[in-house]
A protein has these predicted regions:
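Extended hydrophobic
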Residues: 169-210
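Short, flexible active-site loops
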Residues: 158-168
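Amphipathic alpha-helical effector-binding/dimerization core
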Residues: 61-160
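N-terminal helix-turn-helix
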Residues: 1-76
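A structural signal for short hydrophobic beta-strand segments in well-ordered beta-sheet cores
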Residues: 52-53, 100-101, 207
Length: 210
């Protein structure tokens, strides 16, 4: 596969996000700028190899092969070995959703919380987070716990982009969030109250590297 073709394949796969899990061919073309004939050909190849799946409404979504590859990543393997027993123990004690997230993103401006493990609680309020999903750092408990571990240089770069409101309770003011990060470092855990999902609260603790 040539570098040019590989680049186009990656651009197509990158189109799919948590907010846009399924796309039409036209939407893929608009997002990538790839010529229609090339887009049709590449999409057909991706479907043949289970990297994309064609839905009944002539839309496409990520295929099972991507999930299978993701499960083989060193991160996923380490998570299953080291963290899953602890996630299950928390779930058994609380009956609530239990998540494990890591900091992900090439730069502080692009950083987010990547959920790499989840146990769903039978008594808990549904949330938008899922294994493999990404949520903003400033609006989630796990995100705030991760932010609290960053140094000042990293935080200055992170705060150079606006903090968007996910709900009316989301903290979007830098000074307010910085004060909360100081409190998190002092007490050792982070909290949120309806900042990402209405009706939901969370408690998060930063962990040593697995």
């Amino acid at each position: 596969m040539s570098r040019g073709l590989l680049g186009r394949v990656l651009r197509i796969l990158d189109c799919f996000t948590e907010d846009n899990p399924s796309l039409s061919v036209q939407e893929i073309i608009e997002r990538t700028g790839i010529a229609r004939s090339s887009a049709h050909r590449i999409i057909a190849e991706l479907v043949d190899h289970d990297l994309l799946v064609r839905l009944p409404n002539h839309r496409y979504s990520i295929g099972v092969r991507m999930w299978e590859w993701g499960e083989l990543s060193p991160l996923s393997l380490r998570i299953r070995e080291a963290a899953l027993p602890h996630l299950m123990r928390l779930y058994e004690v609380t009956g609530e959703n239990v998540h494990l997230a890591v900091l992900n993103g090439k730069t502080p401006q692009q950083a987010h919380a990547l959920f790499v493990g989840r146990v769903t609680g039978f008594m808990s309020i549904p949330t938008v987070s899922r294994a493999g999903g990404r949520d903003p750092l400033h609006a989630t408990g796990v995100g705030k716990a991760l932010l609290a571990g960053r140094n000042e240089t990293w935080l200055e770069e992170y705060f150079s982009t606006p903090l968007l409101a996910e709900t009316q309770h989301t903290i979007t003011d830098e000074e307010t969030l910085r004060k909360e990060l100081v409190e998190i470092r002092h007490r050792g855990y982070a909290t949120t109250r309806e900042e990402m999902t209405l009706g939901n609260i969370s408690v998060a603790v930063p962990l040593p590297r697995i």
